[in-house]
Curated annotation (Swiss-Prot):
Xref: Pfam families: ADK, ADK_lid
MF annotations from Gene Ontology: adenylate kinase activity; ATP binding; nucleoside diphosphate kinase activity
HAMAP family, alphabetized: Adenylate_kinase_Adk (MF_00235)
Source superkingdom: Bacteria
Binding site for AMP: 31, 36, 57-59, 85-88, 92, 156, 167
Free-text comment about domains: Consists of three domains, a large central CORE domain and two small peripheral domains, NMPbind and LID, which undergo movements during catalysis. The LID domain closes over the site of phosphoryl transfer upon ATP binding. Assembling and dissambling the active center during each catalytic cycle provides an effective means to prevent ATP hydrolysis.
CDD domains the record matches: ADK (cd01428)
Cystine bridges: none
Cellular component annotations (GO), alphabetically ordered: cytoplasm; cytosol
Organism listed in the record: Neisseria meningitidis serogroup B (strain ATCC BAA-335 / MC58)
Entry protein name: Adenylate kinase
Name of the gene encoding the protein in the UniProt record: adk
Subunit note: Monomer.
């Protein structure tokens, strides 16, 4: 199973990724992890990427694609892999097809923006312990205070409504192009496109995703 998982920040993608990788016995591949591993291992591509990152630049697509090809040639990918957050752009998706890396399925966890804003902007965190609350779904006993220590809870910058909306706008801009690209591919290059309602309970989303993937 060679699949790509798409989903906005806060859509519950990480949880579903764990279910998919466990069900098919495949690794989850994210470009961030891959870059860190290549840099740590000191591979030629890793060294090139490190130089660019150290200079404050963005790693070029050709380096990323090269790393992906190296990564998916490893033994643990013999039954497939799950791409998470890659390809991120149309250029990357096209380069993957040209490089002969085909996908069996593209899975999109679809959650309306209003739900994601509600989920994320309601989060409150106790920094010292990492305990997380939600003003609506999992409120502390005393508003704004940690249940255990009574210390203040904060809203992380990442969870502020304005920030969430900006991240969602970027996600939609990138993803719509990818969805369009994959849905137009024909013949052996064409993956199955699966769109799942991510507002359902976690287990219901899991059942729908795995069912559509043939598990």
């Amino acid at each position: 199973m060679k699949a790509l998982l798409l989903g906005a920040p806060g859509a519950g993608k990480g949880t579903q990724a764990q279910f998919i990788t466990a069900a098919f016995g495949i690794p989850q591949i994210s470009t961030g992890d891959m870059l860190r591993a290549a840099i740590k291992a000191g591979t030629p591509l890793g060294l090139e990427a490190k130089k660019i990152i150290d200079e404050g630049g963005l790693v070029r697509d050709d380096i990323i694609i090269g790393m992906v090809k190296e990564r998916i040639a490893q033994d643990d990918c013999k039954n497939g892999f799950l791409f998470d957050g890659f390809p991120r752009t149309l250029a990357q998706a096209e380069a993957m097809v040209e490089a002969g890396v085909d996908l069996d399925a593209v899975v999109e966890i679809d959650v309306p923006d209003s739900v994601i804003v509600d989920r994320m902007s309601g989060r409150r965190v106790h920094l010292a312990s990492g305990r997380t609350y939600h003003v609506t779904y999992n409120p502390p006993k005393v508003e704004g205070k940690d249940d255990v220590t009574g210390e203040d809870l904060i809203q992380r910058d990442d969870d502020k409504e304005e920030t969430v909306k900006k991240r969602l706008a970027v996600y939609h801009e990138q993803t719509e192009v990818l969805v369009d690209f994959y849905s137009k591919l024909e013949g052996e290059h064409a993956p199955k496109y699966i769109k799942v309602d991510g507002t359902q309970a976690v287990e219901a989303v899991k059942a729908e995703v795995l069912g559509a993937l043939g598990k």
